[in-house]
Amino acid sequence: MKVYYENDADLALLADKKIAVLGFGSQGHAHALNLKDSGMNVCVGLKENSASWVKAEKAGLMVEKTAEAVKWADIIMVLIPDQVQKAVYENDIAPNLKPGDTLAFGHGFNIHYKQIVPPANVNVIMIAPKSPGHLVRRTFVEGAGVPCLIAVHQNVDGKAKDIALAWAKGLGGTKAGVIETNFKDETETDLFGEQAVLCGGSAELIKAGFDTLVEGGYPAELAYFECMHELKLIVDLYYEGGLSRMNYSVSDTAEYGGMTRGPRIITDEVRQNMRQVLKEVQDGTFAKEFIDECNSGYKSMEALRKSNREHKIEGVGEKLRGMMSWLFKKNPKADAGV
């Protein structure tokens, strides 16, 4: 796998381009501000009544309605939620695309699942920082960057990959390393990771551990500390040095207990369920389910959100976090102005 760095990308490729960033949320604000600070000509495209309009203007950015921004631009980066991209594409982007334009995405969902099918006369690329937007911005301001993925779906002028690399450099990504992938692999691994490990698997593991201790007669506060609070300490060790760093850093008791009991939690049945989750990502089952859910007004999703909010661990956690003075600070998104 080739990793691209500073000398592999040329920002001059963007110097004479007009760049539209659609959206000013977590990723949108980082892309727009980093590219602007890298010397590029950037416009943010938003809905006319968007709450982000004033924020973008206060950040020193030119702001236009989405359709006008697309019409003006040579490169259009789509950084709005997956579920609204198709409608925005059909209403505001497609009618204003010009031959030779470059259409860019931060995630491959809508291209891979053919919710958006661009015309054959435009470049289609992806630049996906592997980090939340506030860290993309913060590391850039600090003179560094976060790793990025790039991909090319259509290359009409032979420059699509070079444009993607230049964009990644403008974000600061080439200081950390840029890896080339494709829309299929990025989309499917991203969705599987979210569902099986990061957002789905970890949340269910935490709740199951908490419930087991509480049902066993232990104080809910102790259950929270053991199954939720201390997880960050372990994840930080994974982040810094992998599984070996974690095993080296914990006690022998914890290491032995984890290695001998962990496989009894993640059983062959669990692994088979993971393979089924991956299959549903690969064959489009999940994508169709999610799109149908969005079109139905999020009825199931709202019920699931309510159930999560009402779980006992949430009330216990809120009380305990109120005792942790180091947590009394702004949300990272608020710090970043989004």
From Swiss-Prot:
It catalyses: (2R)-2,3-dihydroxy-3-methylbutanoate + NADP(+) = (2S)-2-acetolactate + NADPH + H(+); (2R,3R)-2,3-dihydroxy-3-methylpentanoate + NADP(+) = (S)-2-ethyl-2-hydroxy-3-oxobutanoate + NADPH + H(+). It comes from Chloroherpeton thalassium (strain ATCC 35110 / GB-78). This is Ketol-acid reductoisomerase (NADP(+)). Involved in the biosynthesis of branched-chain amino acids (BCAA). Catalyzes an alkyl-migration followed by a ketol-acid reduction of (S)-2-acetolactate (S2AL) to yield (R)-2,3-dihydroxy-isovalerate. In the isomerase reaction, S2AL is rearranged via a Mg-dependent methyl migration to produce 3-hydroxy-3-methyl-2-ketobutyrate (HMKB). In the reductase reaction, this 2-ketoacid undergoes a metal-dependent reduction by NADPH to yield (R)-2,3-dihydroxy-isovalerate. The gene is ilvC. It holds the Pfam family KARI_N. Signal peptide: none annotated. One of its GO terms (molecular function) is ketol-acid reductoisomerase activity. Keywords: Amino-acid biosynthesis, Branched-chain amino acid biosynthesis, Magnesium, Metal-binding, NADP, Oxidoreductase. The active site is at H107. GO terms for biological process: isoleucine biosynthetic process; L-valine biosynthetic process. Pathway: Amino-acid biosynthesis; L-isoleucine biosynthesis; L-isoleucine from 2-oxobutanoate: step 2/4; Amino-acid biosynthesis; L-valine biosynthesis; L-valine from pyruvate: step 2/4. PROSITE patterns: KARI_C, KARI_N. Mg(2+) 1 binds at D190, E194. It comes from the Bacteria. Residues 182-327 form the KARI C-terminal knotted domain. GO terms for cellular component: cytosol.
